[in-house]
From Swiss-Prot:
Chain residues that bind ATP: 153-160, 206-214
Comment block on domains: IQ domain mediates interaction with calmodulin. The tail domain is a globular cargo-binding domain.
A GO term for molecular function: calmodulin binding
Protein name, UniProt field: Myosin-5
Family: Belongs to the TRAFAC class myosin-kinesin ATPase superfamily. Myosin family. Plant myosin class XI subfamily.
Function: Myosin heavy chain that is required for the cell cycle-regulated transport of various organelles and proteins for their segregation. Functions by binding with its tail domain to receptor proteins on organelles and exerting force with its N-terminal motor domain against actin filaments, thereby transporting its cargo along polarized actin cables. Contributes to the trafficking of Golgi stacks, mitochondria and peroxisomes. Required for development of pavement cells, trichomes, and stigmatic papillae.
Coiled coil regions in record: 881-1047
PROSITE patterns: DILUTE (PS51126), IQ (PS50096), MYOSIN_MOTOR (PS51456), SH3_LIKE (PS51844)
Main location: cytoplasm
């Protein structure tokens, strides 16, 4: 790798003994050595240094391949920066690095976060474990390949939790929602707590360390659904069962069982954990924050889910308890040499308990522990073990039982979950131990590191393959990249024969082999191997140089731990156990051992398992997750550099970086390269060159070689980036000096101008003072002249005004006298005319009133007489049920006669009106004649007055004294005429008084008649109710008769008797006839004929309903803004009284019609049409219907059209125009406004119809809202991030800054304008269909809430969106939405603009300047009061200024936010920083009813199909 180009002033990284790497500034260069002044003030001289990127984002980068300098200190600093911001995930290409936060971060693992990452390409959102899972799942679905996810890291790095999150996400993608019972994904997820209970334990480095490796194969069918799974485990740490060190713990299951409920503890004969030898070797019995009792119950529940029955669970925990009792069996020396016996009673008691739990003989168990049987050709020898060997036998038995119990649990889980032989593909999740290097490394560490060597080789090949694919994709020339291959280490370990494992197996097969002989064999075999070494101070230790460093192994227990056999006495003991579960474990083992006669060791079997694992991984597309433990104290907020670097090396991350650095470590997109280094060649930017050509010209100008230009990126060798940065720093330094020079020049010029301006101001002041003195003198002289002139004018004007006032007073007195005389004459004349007019009008009105009252009294008397007669006839007819129908027919005939008489009365009344009109015309002619005479007299008087005025004026011209000229004759005649008129006036006044008395008496009589008429009206109502009840009885009797006739027809074939029934015809309401119909049929009797059959009532009603449904199924539009269909349905239902019946089908048929119209409907116009109709109809029902316990009981004054003909005629009498003068007889028509709608006590079908209609209204509303969301959602993806401007903008932006800042370019807001266009389209559609403004405002309110949620969540999940320029872009788009809200008016938008409060405040925070000066209180109370502390913390840590280079809020504010977020995380149930979309219904029926204006139902014209039918003539009625 070429040395980076460094100049004085460059910032570099140098090694530090405390921080691993520290940054500083180069102060001097001496050959290959540089002098660096670190940030601590210390000067370091070194030749090992790396350039530092001073322009790196303050919050780090989410993909370390984006680092300008890809080296160890850059990677370490980037991880540390992101860890401080709680950004625990970081990409390195396709590799995910996960740093354990050691605290709960539930908000990034909730279901809504899974929804965000579902189907999103890798790298589009912030790094996350869900993104890796989604990438594997999408690759499997799209390419049909098997995929695997390898999770690695040292103990405590978070591998187990990461694996659980991966499995949760895969179950979320491939799960089956709504499936009853145990699903495959549930069983896979619940297998984790079971395996953790039996395979995890507390270690020095981790409270929940997995002591085994695990590979989970999740199988998927062709639809991408989980169809099966298999779990493979590797190398369980068996020695932990018997031996633990302080402060570690044994496996969790032992402590869980000791914390079980009291009944279980009694059942398994357990005590406190500190009383068991296998547990009390350590002082740690409990874990912080873990309740073993609840974990025990949770484990039992998980075992139920994975398919382990209650009997099997009981057997499992009996075995676990037996192992604890086995550990408490101690041995003492026996009587014989090298023999042993049970030490004491306590040990004997535990022996008996263990035997009881294992259901075997206690003596047999004792013999199996302390005796061995040796078979020779001559005899069978039984020998006793000494106490030490007996303890070893006990421990061996415990380890054997536990390991096979663990294997049984794994096999049971696999059997329960089941594997799908027809699965299309799999995703494997590998959770395996990371590289280990301790002070004491035994056989377990040897196997673990062997595994990691295998995985590292696979990892290196994968990284090399990714590099090769990147170069091939960009179509650049590349050569082979060398990388360290660890094949020699693998051969050292696994070569057969001659490898360490082979030599270990060989030593195990010889009984006399020891660890010394085994070590000597290794030293002799590998003394020349580069990767093998012998420590100087040990005879049995050996050292292997792994890829992550040298590890020294202690071979003391290699042979013992490698042996995989079971003692024959142990096997015989448990095979004879009465417990089928225990016997089954050892029986299966016996079958396996009998099938294989070769020697089997742990190492060989592990090597075979590892070989099988690598074959599986090689057949899949791998995805890597490297887990990092930031510190060894397991606390949050601590980042230990040396510890992390060691793990990066062990995890192969630095090796992957080294492979990248061996090729082209720096890769920049053309746009980014020009944006950063375009200033090195300004003439290139000013030219109209393609981006690729421009980049080529810049590199050629700087004489760089050995770089590559791909299709979209530039690939630079190591060191070339530093060289370009050095030249860029030089250019920027020169530019800074030019700016400083120009600034100093500007300051000097500014100082000179200020001095000059001060002198000018002083001179101006002095000249002004002189000018003001001269001006004052001239002003005094002018004022004196002005005073003299005004005084002379005042004296002359006062004399003139006095003369003029005297003249005016004289003239005014004369003219007033003349006017008063003329006014008196006119007032007398006007009074006479008014008296005459009132007297004549009173006479005419009195005559008309008498005629009207006489006619009404006559009509009322006659109607009362007829009503009484009909009542008597009805009472007589009611005594005989058989004659009831005849009475009804006669009654209807009588009513017909009354109708004819009514016509006659109308004609008489018309004649009276005509006579009255003629009389009034005569009176008007007489009045007109008198007015003409009055005008002539008035004209004569005026002429005489004019002549008198002329004479007076002529006389005044001769003589100044006034002369009064009197014509005595005329005055006398006028006086006589006035006297005569006064006499007439007095006589007329006397007559008027008499007429007034007569009028008062007539009013009294009229009131009496009104009371009588009101009493008659009440009686008529009572009669109508009686008739209605009788008619209902007739209808019920007719129904019974019909049923009887049908039964008779089924018995007898003859039906001739039915032909003798009287025939009736249907009389409908027409403009020529004044009869009525209510949609059902009204029948009038006619002469009986046998030619015209009668239609049944139900059939006719069915036809009317069919016609109504056929009409509303079409789009019949609107009438003056009112939905015709809703008004039509409402009027028909009211007229047919459908709301008041117990059973009817019309409601269900209307609902079915609406459902068929909107089913699978994508046309917004149709949905809005039915939304308007449904809302209007619901408004009618809300104001009309009221729930009642009985039938449709309404007040007589407000009931609808009666069903009988007599009732309808009576109702028409009360509502006739002739009765307009009597309010108590005026009926209420259904055609009035909503204020006149009558209240109906609805039955159950009507109330159910209202509920169904409400449900359909909400459904249509939801369909319109979801359709709008579907249209807007694709546009929002382009609205959250500013589109990249073309390269020409880099130049034009410098010269046209002002204009671009004022008005955003049209292409930049095109996506926002598309949203506005979509909103306008839907608004026009809803307004064209007269959708209520409340519903429109609610729709747009929820749409704006959806926009707020989508934009805000995207902003929090994508760091590239949290930039200054992106904030300006979104703010410009929001301004477009605000303008649209203003144009659409508040009536239709409501509070929609307020729904964007989260994104508005977030964007406002992004674009404010001087963020570091803002305190947390100012941010939370003034800038962003709506945002939560988690959301503010997320935005503050992700913010980066790509325009001005400013920083986010201060570190103190960040620290305070982090502390508050931590507190909230501990206390809150859900502390997700993401918003949830609200899909509820935001209105109620009362809201709709209150918001809608009154609708005149009667003013709506029915469609032609209805208008042409005579049964619907009631729809043509109009309200007065």
């Amino acid at each position: 790798m070429a040395a980076p180009v460094i100049i004085v002033g460059s910032h570099v990284w140098v090694e530090d003994p405390h921080l691993a790497w520290i940054d500083g500034e180069v102060t001097r260069i001496d050959g290959i050595n540089v002098h660096v002044k670190t940030k601590k003030g210390k000067t370091v001289v070194t030749n090992v240094y790396f350039p530092k990127d001073t322009e790196a984002p303050s919050g780090g980068v989410d993909d370390m391949t984006k680092l300008s300098y890809l080296h160890e200190p850059g990677v370490l600093r980037n991880l540390e920066t992101r860890y401080e911001l709680n950004e625990i995930y970081t990409y390195t290409g396709n590799i995910l690095i996960a740093v354990n936060p050691f605290q709960r971060l539930p908000h990034i693992y909730e279901t809504d976060m899974m929804e965000q990452y579902k189907g999103i390409a890798l790298g589009e959102l912030s790094p996350h474990v869900f993104a890796i899972g989604d990438a594997a799942y999408r690759a499997m679905i799209n390419e049909g390949k098997n995929n695997s996810i390898l999770v690695s890291g040292e103990s405590g790095a978070g591998k187990t939790e990461t694996t659980k999150m991966l499995m949760r996400y895969l179950a979320f993608l491939g799960g089956r929602s709504g499936v009853e019972g145990r699903t495959v994904e549930q069983q896979v997820l619940e297998s984790n707590p079971v395996l953790e209970a039996f395979g995890n334990a507390k270690t020095l480095r981790n409270n929940n360390s997995s002591r085994f490796g695990k590979f989970v194969e999740i199988q998927f069918d062709k639809n991408g659904r989980i169809s099966g799974a298999a779990i493979r485990t590797y190398l369980l740490e068996r020695s932990r069962v018997c031996q633990i060190s302080d402060p570690e713990r044994n496996y969790h299951c032992f402590y869980l069982l000791c914390a079980a409920p009291p009944e279980d503890i009694k059942k398994y004969k357990l005590e406190n954990p500190h009383k068991f030898h296998y547990l009390n070797q350590s002082s740690c019995y409990k874990l912080d924050g873990v309740d073993d009792a609840s974990e025990y119950l949770e484990t039992r529940r998980a075992m139920d889910v994975v398919g382990i029955s209650n009997e099997e669970q009981e057997a499992i925990f009996r075995v676990v308890a037996a192992i604890l009792h086995l550990g408490n069996i101690d041995f003492g020396k026996g009587e014989e040499i090298d023999s042993s016996v049970i030490k004491d009673k306590d040990s004997r008691s535990h022996l008996n308990m263990a035997a009881e739990l294992l259901m075997c003989n206690a003596q047999s168990l004792e013999d199996a522990l302390i005796r061995r049987v040796m078979v020779t050709p001559e005899e069978i020898i039984t020998r006793t073990l000494d106490p030490d060997n007996a303890i070893a036998s006990r421990d061996t038995l415990a380890k054997t039982i536990y390991s096979h119990l663990f294997d049984w649990i794994v096999n049971k889980i696999n059997t329960s979950i089941g594997q799908d032989p027809r699965s299309k593909s799999i995703i494997g999740v590998l959770d395996i131990y990371g590289f280990e290097s301790f002070k004491c490394n035994s056989f377990e560490q040897f196997c673990i590191n062997f595994t990691n060597e295998k995985l590292q080789q696979h990892f290196n090949q994968h990284v090399f393959k990714m590099e090769q694919e990147e170069y091939t994709k960009e179509e650049i020339a590349w050569s082979y990249i060398e990388f360290i291959d660890n094949q020699d280490v693998l051969e050292l370990i696994e070569k057969k024969p001659g490898g360490i494992i082979s030599l270990l197996d060989e030593a195990c097969m010889f009984p006399k082999s020891t660890h010394e002989t085994f070590s000597q064999k290794l030293f002799q075999t590998f003394k020349e191997h580069e990767r093998f070494a012998k420590p100087k101070l040990s005879r049995t230790d050996f050292t292997i140089s792994h890829y992550a460093g040298e590890v020294t192994y202690q071979s003391n227990h290699f042979i013992d731990k490698n042996k995989d056999y079971i003692v024959a006495e142990h096997q015989a003991l448990f095979t004879a156990s009465n417990c089928k579960f225990v016997a089954g474990l050892f029986h299966a083992l016996h079958e396996d051992s009998s099938r294989s006669s070769k020697f089997s060791s742990i190492g060989s079997r592990f090597k075979q398992q590892l070989h099988s694992l690598m074959e599986s991984l090689n057949g899949t597309e791998p995805h890597y997750i490297r887990c990092i433990k930031p510190n060894n104290v397991l606390k949050p907020g601590i980042f230990e550099n040396f510890n992390v670097i060691h793990q990066l090396r062990c995890g192969g991350v630095l090796e992957a970086i080294r492979i990248s650095c061996a090729g082209y470590p720096t890769r920049l997109a053309f746009y980014d390269f020009l944006d950063r280094f375009g200033l090195l060649a300004p003439e290139v930017l000013e030219g109209n060159y393609d981006d690729k050509v421009a980049c080529q010209m810049i590199l050629d100008k700087k004489s760089l070689t050995d770089y590559q230009i791909g299709k979209t990126k530039i690939f630079l060798r190591a060191g070339q980036m530093a060289e370009l940065d050095a030249r860029r720093a030089e250019v920027l330094g020169n530019a800074a000096r030019v700016i400083q020079r120009q600034f100093r020049t500007c300051m000097a010029r500014k100082n000179y101008r200020s001095i000059r301006n001060a002198a000018i101001v002083l001179q101006s002041f002095l000249r002004g003072e002189i000018a003001r003195a001269v001006h004052k003198k001239l002003r005094i002289e002018a004022a004196a002249l002005r005073v003299q002139k005004n005084f002379r004018r005042y004296v002359d004007r006062k004399s003139f005004v006095t003369t003029r006032s005297s003249t005016i007073v004289l003239q005014t007195g004369l003219r007033a006298m003349i006017a008063r005389s003329e006014f008196r004459l006119r007032r007398q004349r006007k009074a006479a005319i008014v008296l005459q007019a009132h007297w004549r009008g009173r006479q005419a009105f009195s005559y008309y009133t008498r005629l009207q009252k006489a006619a009404i009294v006559t009509q009322c008397a006659w109607r009362c007489r007829l009503a009484r007669r009909e009542l008597r006839m009805l009472k007589m007819a009611a005594r005989d049920t058989g004659a009831l129908k005849d009475a009804k027919n006669k009654l209807e005939q009588r009513v017909e006669e009354l109708s004819l008489r009514l016509h006659l009365e109308k004609r008489l009344r018309t004649d009276l009106e005509e006579a009255k009109v003629q009389e009034v015309a005569k009176l008007q002619e007489a009045l007109h004649t008198m007015r003409l005479q009055l005008k002539e007299t008035t004209a004569m008087v005026v002429k005489e007055q004019e002549a008198a005025r002329v004479a007076i004026e002529e006389a005044s011209s001769v003589n100044k004294e006034p002369v009064v000229v009197e014509d005595t004759e005329k005055i006398d005649s006028l006086s006589n005429e006035i006297d005569r008129l006064k006499g007439l006036l007095s006589s007329e006044t006397h007559k008027a008084d008499e007429a007034q008395h007569a009028y008062q008496s007539a009013l009294v009589q009229n009131e009496e008649l009104c009371k009588k008429l009101e009493e008659a009206g009440r009686k008529i109502d009572q009669l109508q109710d009686s008739v209605q009840r009788f008619q209902e009885k007739v209808f019920s009797l007719e129904s019974e008769n019909k049923v009887l006739r049908q039964q008779t027809l089924t018995i007898s074939p003859t039906t001739r008797a039915l032909a003798l029934r009287p025939k009736t015809t249907i009389i409908q309401r027409t403009p020529e006839k004044d009869t009525f119909s209510n949609g059902e049929t009204t029948q009038l009797q006619e002469p009986e004929t046998e030619d015209r059959p009668q239609k049944s009532l139900n059939q006719k009603q069915q036809e009317n309903q069919e016609l109504l449904l056929k009409s509303i199924s079409e789009d019949i539009g609107f009438s003056e803004g009112k939905p015709v269909a809703a008004c039509l349905i409402y009027k028909c239902l009211i007229h047919w009284r459908s709301f008041e019946v117990e059973r009817t089908s019309i409601f269900n048929r209307i609902i079915e019609t609406i459902a068929s119209a909107i089913e699978m409907q994508e046309n917004s116009d149709v949905l809005c049409y039915w939304l308007s109709n449904s809302a209007t109809l619901l408004m009618f029902l809300q104001r009309t219907l009221k729930a009642g316990a009985t039938g449709s009981i309404t007040t007589p004054r407000r009931r609808g059209m009666p069903s009988s003909l007599f009732g309808r005629v009576s109702q028409s009498f009360r509502g006739s125009p002739q009765s307009a003068g009597f309010p108590f007889m005026t009926g209420r028509a259904i055609g009035g406004g909503l204020d006149e709608l009558r209240q109906v006590e609805a039955k159950y079908p009507a109330l159910l119809f209202k509920q169904q209609l409400t449900a359909f209204l909400e459904k249509i509303y939801g369909m319109i809202r979801d359709k709008m969301k579907k249209e807007i959602s694709p546009l929002l993806a382009s609205c959250i991030q500013v589109p990249r401007t073309p390269r020409s903008g880099l130049v034009k932006g410098r010269s046209q800054n002002t204009q671009n800042n004022v008005v955003a370019p049209k292409p930049m807001i095109a996506h926002w304008q598309n949203i506005v266009t979509c909103l306008n389209g839907h608004l026009r559609t809803m307004r064209a269909n007269y959708v209520p403004s409340l519903l429109i405002s609610k729709v747009f309110g929820q749409i704006f809430s959806f926009i707020n949620v989508q934009l805000f969540n995207s902003l929090l999940l994508r760091r590239e969106c949290c930039s200054f320029s992106n904030g300006e872009y979104v703010k410009t788009g929001l301004a477009e939405l605000e303008k649209w809200c203003h144009d659409a008016t508040e009536e239709f938008v409501g509070s929609a603009w307020d729904e964007l409060k989260h994104i508005r405040q977030a964007v406002g925070f992004l674009v404010i300047h001087q963020k570091p000066k803002k305190s947390l209180k100012e941010i939370t109370t003034e800038l962003c009061p709506v945002l939560s502390i988690q959301q503010l913390y997320r935005i503050s840590t992700m913010y980066w200024d790509d325009k001005y280079g400013t920083h986010s809020v201060s570190t103190e504010v960040i620290a305070t936010m982090r502390a508050e977020v931590s507190d909230v995380s501990k206390s809150a149930i859900s502390n997700s920083f993401l918003l949830d979309d609200d899909s509820s219904i935001p209105f109620s029926l009362d809201d709709i009813s209150k918001s809608m204006q009154n609708v005149e139902v009667a003013e709506v014209d029915p469609p032609p199909l209805i208008r042409q039918n005579s049964n619907f003539m009631f729809l043509l009625e109009r309200s007065d």
